Amino acid sequence: MKLKTILCAALLLVAGQAAAQEKSITIATEGGYAPWNFSGPGGKLDGFEIDLANALCEKMKAKCQIVAQNWDGIMPSLTGKKYDAIMAAMSVTPKRQEVIGFSIPYAAGINGFAVMGDSKLAEMPGLGETYSLDSQADAAKKAIADISSFLNGTTVGVQGSTTASTFLDKYFKGSVDIKEYKSVEEHNLDLTSGRLDAVLANATVLAAAIEKPEMKGAKLVGPLFSGGEFGVVAVGLRKEDTALKADFDAAIKAASEDGTIKTLSLKWFKVDVTPQ
């Protein structure tokens, strides 16, 4: 009887330790930035970052909950401890680094313009080219100058408080009328309604949106841009959560090395966005 009691106690102790060691992480996403993250039928969250978050949580041996949060409040709610991490196509920028910390990158950011196919802007030069604002700075600046001249006097929509809005402010302010929106869906609607001449956003998001009936007639134009203001995409974290950062870093590194990020990239974007 004593041996049985001791064994039962030992099993309960081991089970208790295992439960205590299991991490519980709440991850916020925007839920309106397809195909990175979006709300599907019944409000279920889906997309590249939902799949990747689940894969990372499995590698971290963590129990994760993914919640939707409006973009405008996504960083304040993190610092206010409403959740533990952000996976919402958030690029790492110096301004954001003043407020929160970041994991190592899990995706590269590539951005471009979209217009309606019957617009004169559909002939924007540079289609098929991709310029890095870092390693191809001179070529990128020339391409930007060409586009700025081409777009002169037009109205361009962009989601506010994003790297895309920063890019427009830096390179196009004065030559175009910049109109900021709360979401990509909102500026896409104004594009198709004729209230905008062009929009700038993540190219993977625009490519997915253009395939939908509500964006019929829209097309990607001009070159794509990466690096610089667009940077890389990483998990947003509170600066003090160094242990959680280490866990995410290790999981992302493993997901990059074993091809998980590439597989999910090809599934959702048809291109590999694994950081190089």
UniProtKB/Swiss-Prot annotation:
Subcellular location: Periplasm
Induction summary: By octopine.
The keyword Lipoprotein is assigned to this record: no
Gene3D superfamilies named among the record's database cross-references: Periplasmic binding protein-like II (3.40.190.10)
Principal localisation: periplasm
Disulphide connectivity of cysteines: C57-C64
Any Pfam family the entry gives: SBP_bac_3
Any one of the GO CC terms: membrane
Function: Component of the octopine active transport system probably consisting of four subunits: Q, M, P and T.
Family: Belongs to the bacterial solute-binding protein 3 family.
Name of the protein: Octopine-binding periplasmic protein
Organism whose genome encodes this protein: Rhizobium radiobacter
